[in-house]
Every structure is written in structure tokens, then in C-alpha cells.
């Protein structure tokens, strides 16, 4: 069903900021697109979706994740460690035990968690490509995402050199030559990449880091290859002071200055984290059009700090919201990410640092902007019908004078009456209709036991 009329909602949060942030009325969807908004009469035979007691928002857009980490939550050894040691004790410790079953189960867990929190678009930064694999991780991830019906952006990661840590006894991450990496990205792009503004599938060029994962001089070639293929660029940057120290010691400059010299700034580039950027780096990001995948919960959990997302947003820069891998936050859902952003910036900058409407815009319009999915991210005629109906009939929301912002400012596990991608229903009454949760729980337990025992 891609034609229907949503009626009786409490209100609509459009994904815009300012005067256009709210609308009231009905939403008509035709051929998976938003056709009209207002006081609308049902046409004869038109399907009606009753949104009584619901707030309607655009589908939420997660711009940075590592789905393979969804079976690595709450590993005791890594719970109280900062980034470098956590990497060694958790994802780098387990990566070589992630076989086809483990990746499929992990991706299913992560996608279910996201979809049940209102996500309709997921960008996953996957960087595990071992020659030992007898399966294709790219194909597996697209197939799994296809079951959920979400828009899926696969950021094809990888490294040409490994990273070692003090006291390292982990299996090194798999590496490949630069030619191998570029050939594999090109192959994936030819099969999966759709450049349309309402694409369901995208490929992005995404080396694991521009600093620790590549040999000097490779960044420019990677950027040129990506742009030649019509692909966007993504990576981690400035997640903590390790990045600052690395570029200062090796190149005598800060991370954003350094990547700017290697053609890694522009409106087709976005970075996860950017926690330690100084004001000049933020200005450079804004002027170039490069975007941020803001990961507030992950950065807080690992003690990395708070990214200057508010500073970039004030300049008019591209800020999006992301959950990052579940191994480093234990709750990789979009409502927790929204609530974390809303509260953390106020803790640092004061009560006026971030409004609910701006936080939502990062999770919707901002996500569409950094991913280049311009037909999504806001509720307006002519946009894709990626829509979420959040129920507010819960003690969590009772007593609120402004009922529209409840899903953002109250946190907690939401109840979604309906969720749509291009007008196709993916959630009904708080459930993913096709997904057997009991089986998924058993699969998760089996995989976790195997990871812990080997």
C-alpha cells in the first residue's frame, strides 16, 4: 500500500526548524510520495490511517553505524575504557569471529532496534572484508536491510594498513591493497548504487579512518576515484585527541586542515564524530559544505567529549545524527540518540543550546542533506512518504503541555503505531510484522555465547 490518507494526528513535526517546524492536518500519500497536507476529505475508497493520539514525524535517518557490533554490547572488559583501549578489548578482539551467521544476526538486531525507534534510513560503515570470508558482506547487508524495507547506505570501509595498540594481542584487522579497495568499491557501486534523490540503495567510499588506516598519499587517489564513480565520501575523524596528536606530530597541522589538503572536504563528504574540532576547523567544514554525523551517546559513553554540532549548525552547516556501533553505547536507537543530543548540549552550553525542533532536524533533514537523499528528511508535498506515527498514550507523555515534542524530550522506548518508507509499511503497532523476536533472541544468545567462548 503506497496510497493512503493519514488523519486525526495531534500534529506534524516537519523536520524543518523555525516557523515551518510544525503543521496540523492530514497527509495524503500517493505512489509513495506526499501529495497534500491540510484539512483533507477522504476520496471514495481511499485507505484511511487513523493517527489519533499520534505525533507524525519524518522517518529518522541514522548516518553512521557499525551493524556488526550489535552482538558486542556490554562486554565487561570494555565498559569503562576510553576509545583506543575499548577498540582493542571489544571490536578488534572479536572481529575475526564474525562469520556469516554472526553478521546476519548482528545486522538483524541492529536494524530491528533502529526501525523500532523510528529509523527509515540507515547508513552503515562496514570495514570488515577478510580474504577468509566465503560470503560477501556487502550483499549480506543489503539483503538484510531489504527485508526491513529501509533505505540503506553502505559505506564501504577498509584499510591498507593496520593499527596497533599498546599491549596489543588482538588479531590485526584485515587489510587490502589500495587497488583492491578501489576495485571492490567500484564493483559494489556498479551493482548497488542508485544516485537518485529517493534511492533505496547507495554505496559510499569510506576508508575506516583517513589517519590510522591508510598509507600517506592514498587519500587523494581515493577521493578522485569516489568522485569519478559519483560516490560520496565518509570516514571517522577527530573522535578524540588521538587524531589531533597524530596529525600534529606527523604533518604539523590539525585533522581538518590535513584532510583539506587531500581533497577530503566538500558537500559530498561527511565525517563521524568531529568531537575535538576547534572553531577554525568548524568554519572550514561549514565553508566547504562537509557534514557531521553527530554521535552524542557513543562519544559520552567512551568519554571522548561533546562534538561542536551546535557550533556547526549555527553557521548553517550540515549536521546529522547517528547512533554509532552498539558495542560502544549499548542502545543504538534513534530516540536515545535524539534525547542524548538534546540533553548533552544543554549540559555543556546551557538550557538554550539546543531546541527539540533542531535536534529532530539533525535526525531528519540533516541526515538527508549529508547523505544526498534530497527527496527525504522532511514532511512536505513532493517528498518521499518516509513517515513515523509516534503514539503518545503513555505515562511518559501524560501531562505534557506541548505534546508534539514528547518523543524527543522524554526519551525512553517509543511505541510506533505505523512507520513507512516510500509509503510502504515497515512497522505496525510497535512490531515488525515479519520478524520473529523470540527466534532473534535465541540467535543472539547463541552468537554471543560462541563469541565469548572462542
For each of these PLM feature ranges, what is it?
Residues 131-272, 280-282:
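Metal-coordinating catalytic core of metallo-dependent amide/deamination hydrolases
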Amino acid at each position: 500500500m503506497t496510497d493512503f490518507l493519514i488523519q486525526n494526528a495531534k500534529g506534524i513535526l516537519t523536520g524543518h526548524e523555525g516557523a515551518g517546524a510544525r503543521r496540523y492536518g492530514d497527509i495524503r500519500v500517493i505512489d509513495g510520495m506526499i501529495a497534500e497536507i491540510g484539512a483533507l476529505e477522504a476520496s471514495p475508497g481511499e485507505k484511511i490511517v487513523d493517527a489519533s493520539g499520534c505525533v507524525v514525524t519524518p522517518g529518522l535517518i541514522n548516518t553512521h553505524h557499525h551493524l556488526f557490533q550489535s552482538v558486542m554490547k556490554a562486554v565487561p572488559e570494555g565498559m569503562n575504557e576510553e576509545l583506543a583501549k575499548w577498540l582493542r578489548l571489544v571490536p578488534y578482539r572479536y572481529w575475526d569471529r564474525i562469520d556469516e551467521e554472526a553478521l546476519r544476526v548482528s545486522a538483524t538486531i541492529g536494524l530491528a532496534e533502529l526501525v523500532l525507534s523510528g529509523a527509515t534510513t540507515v547508513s552503515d560503515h562496514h570495514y570488515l572484508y577478510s580474504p577468509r570470508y566465503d560470503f560477501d558482506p556487502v550483499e549480506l547487508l543489503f539483503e538484510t536491510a531489504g527485508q526491513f524495507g529501509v533505505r540503506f547506505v553502505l559505506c564501504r570501509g577498509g584499510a591498507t594498513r593496520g593499527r596497533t595498540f599498546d599491549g596489543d594481542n588482538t588479531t590485526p584487522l584485515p587489510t587490502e591493497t589500495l587497488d583492491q579497495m578501489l576495485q571492490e568499491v567500484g564493483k559494489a557501486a556498479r551493482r548497488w548504487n542508485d544516485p537518485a534523490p529517493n534511492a533505496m540503495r547507495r554505496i559510499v567510499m569510506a576508508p575506516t579512518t583517513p589517519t590510522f588506516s591508510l598509507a600517506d598519499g592514498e587519500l587523494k587517489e581515493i577521493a578522485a576515484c569516489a568522485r569519478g564513480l559519483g560516490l560520496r565520501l565518509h570516514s571517522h575523524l577527530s573522535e578524540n585527541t588521538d587524531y589531533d596528536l597524530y596529525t600534529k606530530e606527523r604533518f604539523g597541522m590539525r585533522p581538518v586542515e590535513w584532510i583539506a589538503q587531500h581533497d577530503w572536504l566538500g558537500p559530498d563528504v561527511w565525517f563521524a564524530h568531529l568531537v575535538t574540532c576547534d572553531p577554525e576547523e568548524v568554519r572550514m567544514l561549514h565553508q566547504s559544505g562537509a557534514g557531521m554525523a553527530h554521535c552524542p551517546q557513543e562519544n559520552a559513553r567512551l568519554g571522548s567529549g561533546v562534538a561542536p554540532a551546535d557550533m556547526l549548525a549555527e553557521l548553517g552547516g550540515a549536521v546529522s545524527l547517528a547512533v554509532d556501533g552498539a558495542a560502544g553505547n549499548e542502545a543504538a536507537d534513534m530516540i536515545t540518540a535524539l534525547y542524548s543530543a538534546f540533553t548533552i548540549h544543554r549540559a555543556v552550553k546551557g538550557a538554550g543550546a539546543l531546541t527539540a525542533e533542531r535536534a529532530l532536524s539533525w535526525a531528519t533533514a540533516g541526515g538527508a542533506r549529508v547523505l544526498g537523499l534530497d527527496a527525504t528528511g522532511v514532511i512536505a508535498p513532493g517528498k518521499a512518504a518516509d513517515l513515523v506515527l509516534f503514539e503518545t498514550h503513555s505515562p511518559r507523555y501524560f501531562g505534557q503541555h506541548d505534546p508534539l515534542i514528547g518523543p524527543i524530550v522524554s526519551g525512553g522506548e517509543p511505541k510506533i503505531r505505523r512507520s513507512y518508507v516510500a509509503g510502504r509499511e515497515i512497522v505496525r503497532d510497535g512490531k515488525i510484522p515479519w520478524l520473529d523476536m523470540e527466534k532473534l533472541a535465541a540467535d543472539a544468545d547463541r552468537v554471543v555465547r560462541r563469541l565469548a567462548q572462542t
